[in-house]
Amino acid sequence: MKWFPSLLLMGALSMGACQGQTAESSSTTTTEAAASFQNIQVAGAQTMINSGEHILIDVRTPGEFTEAHIDGATMIDINGSDFESGMAALDKSKSYVVICRSGGRSARASQYMIDHGFTKVTNVEGGMNAWLASGYPSVAGQ
């Protein structure tokens, strides 16, 4: 019977140690969930682009980019062999607006950026399709 109080004490300490790990794991999960990109409609994107405080990244193919793109955009083709090196060359402390044709590829590229340490990333919902349908300006060629 002398061992019973010792057993209770060891059990209580073990439970306390496990409880601390759970709290730490929850904190890590919350931090990871907080790291995400923002979505914005084209009107908001135009405001951001015109402010001059954000860098516009177009992740479409060279053919799509040549057909029509937003003036000042930097093309980094998400399906191109130089996508990762193009992203690695960007300054992670800057703010980025990412666009594609319809919003799917730019969402993937935005998540890639977040996963690789970028913190200020905004995806344009609807992409160039929505941009052009709204009558916002574009340019052709490289």
Residue ranges, per PLM feature:
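Short hydrophobic beta-strand that contains or immediately precedes a catalytic carboxylate
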Residues: 45, 55-60
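Rhodanese-like catalytic fold shared by cysteine-dependent sulfurtransferases
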Residues: 2-8, 12-51, 66-95, 104-142
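Short, surface-exposed ligand- or partner-binding patches at beta-edge/loop junctions that are enriched
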Residues: 99
